[in-house]
Swiss-Prot record:
Stored PROSITE patterns: GLUTR
Name of protein: Glutamyl-tRNA reductase
Single biological process term from Gene Ontology: protoporphyrinogen IX biosynthetic process from glutamate
Gene this chain is encoded by: hemA
Protein EC: 1.2.1.70
Reaction equation(s) it catalyzes: (S)-4-amino-5-oxopentanoate + tRNA(Glu) + NADP(+) = L-glutamyl-tRNA(Glu) + NADPH + H(+)
Domain comment as written in the entry: Possesses an unusual extended V-shaped dimeric structure with each monomer consisting of three distinct domains arranged along a curved 'spinal' alpha-helix. The N-terminal catalytic domain specifically recognizes the glutamate moiety of the substrate. The second domain is the NADPH-binding domain, and the third C-terminal domain is responsible for dimerization.
Species this chain originates from: Nitratidesulfovibrio vulgaris (strain DP4)
Highest taxon listed in the record's lineage: Bacteria
Length: 440
């Protein structure tokens, strides 16, 4: 059975944020725990886990690949496979390649054209390489995905008017507060999303930016870039009272802000409104916070309306990008099919060469001693004959194998026609048998 490419995943279209956080694999713990082992069934694996999607790429043999990935994924999160299954999509072969190229090109993102997904995919690939979980197929596929993403960004305008999740968060804040110059914002986390949010907040005219991060030095570095103030993480709840707008984007595995924490903050603020935007998955802020008076909590799924308004501007460019994706998907499919054909070509050439060498040895034995020049001439003649005899069948196989549906059938015919799978009968045995029949 031939190896195939499988993509198993869920995203912002198939699962809400509460489901995505239950099944998030932000630390690639599936690989670390070895619950998708590299063996005869699964030979390569890569995990992409972001706030909007979890996708597992696997190369393997047979339908057991999907069930094994689902079991491992659910087990890694301490969940039941049946709870995961309703939210999952599965792509195989050509469809898996197309989907990955769409993802890498940000055509499948909540924010079409956003640049973060490509960096996240590259990071996932780096981690898979570090754990020795990729081989020739995924290596080729991921490099091709990066190339496709580059083509889309350079040959279309799909990214020219793109917004980021951070931009959408700030736009939502502007709709609530209007003029921003009399309000203060706090960023919890100091990663790429926080940096983008700081950029958009500053552009919107925010009066002050605070940055709270577990690693104080990183928080101070980000605050310095935007003329803000860094806060020690242990002082978070004391300083929350200073902020009107809080945007949280940490990589915590559970909520870091709960309703009981905010009650005291509200008292110290004399119950002035607080606006929380949680763009982390898993979520940083307990949903119960939204039940408090004068507190307004939004999560990443609430940003879709802002994103949809921006989407209309990019639909035409996205259509051009999809044409590129289709073209490159076809090219990769041809390469993958050529990979399937290669063992048959190698076996055919090796069999022909073995027969030629056996015949040469038999001929030299009959001739007796010959000089080196004669021997070289005989070897050159046989080598030329092998190449010329194999040229037509190999060319025919390559041409027919490019036909997606017919390719495997022609491989099977060729292997049977040239007896390439008969391991028990040496290639010269048939010649000896035929010669024996002719002599009698």
């Amino acid at each position: 059975m031939e190896r195939d490419i499988y993509l198993i995943g869920l995203n912002h279209r198939t699962a809400g944020v509460e489901v995505r956080e239950r099944f998030a694999l932000t630390d690639c713990n599936v690989l670390e725990q070895g619950v998708v082992p590299i063996d005869d069934v699964v030979s390569e694996v890569l995990i992409l886990s972001t706030c909007n999607r979890v996708e597992i790429l696997a190369v393997g043999r047979g339908p057991e690949v999907v069930s094994r990935v689902l079991r491992g994924w659910a087990a890694a999160r301490g969940q039941c496979e049946h709870d995961l299954a309703p939210y999952v999509y599965t792509h195989k072969g050509h469809e898996a390649v197309r989907h990955l190229f769409r993802v890498a090109s940000s055509l499948d993102s909540m924010v079409v054209g956003e640049p973060q997904i490509l960096g996240q995919l590259k990071d996932a690939y780096r981690k898979a390489i570090e754990r020795n979980c990729t081989r020739v197929i995924l290596n080729r596929l991921l490099h091709k995905a990066f190339s496709v993403a580059k083509r889309v960004r350079t040959e279309t305008g799909v990214a020219s008017s793109a917004v980021s999740i951070s931009y959408a968060a700030v736009e939502l804040a502007k709709r609530i507060f209007g003029e921003m110059n009399q309000y203060k914002a706090m960023l919890i986390g100091a990663g790429e999303m926080a940096e983008l949010a700081a950029t958009h907040l500053l552009h919107a005219g925010i009066s002050k930016i605070y940055v709270a991060n577990r690693t104080f030095e990183r928080g101070r570095e980000l605050a310095r870039q935007f003329n803000g103030e860094a806060i020690h993480f242990e002082d978070l709840f004391e300083r929350l009272a200073d902020a009107d707008i809080i945007i949280s984007s940490t990589g915590a595995h559970e909520a870091i802000i709960r309703a009981r924490d905010i009650k005291d903050v509200l008292r110290r603020r004399k119950h002035r409104p607080m606006f929380f935007i949680d763009i982390a998955v898993p979520r940083d802020i307990d949903p119960d916070v939204n039940n408090l008076d004068n507190v307004y909590l939004y999560d990443i799924d609430d940003l879709k309306e802002v994103v949809e308004e921006n989407l209309a501007q990019r639909r035409e460019e996205a259509s051009k990008a999809l044409t590129i994706v289709e073209e490159e998907t076809g090219k990769f499919g041809q390469w993958l099919r050529s990979l399937e054909l290669q063992p048959t070509i190698v076996d055919l050439i090796r069999r022909s060469e073995r027969i030629a060498q056996d015949e040469l040895a038999r001929t030299l034995k009959r001739l007796g001693p010959v000089d080196d020049e004669t021997r070289d001439a005989l070897e050159a003649m046989l080598s030329s004959m092998v190449r010329k005899l194999n040229h037509e069948p190999i060319t025919f196989l390559k041409r027919r194998h490019s036909e997606e549906d017919a390719g495997p059938r022609y491989i099977d015919i060729a292997r049977r026609m040239f007896n390439l799978d008969d391991d028990n009968v040496p290639p010269d045995a048939h010649c000896d048998r035929r010669r024996h029949d002719e002599d009698n």
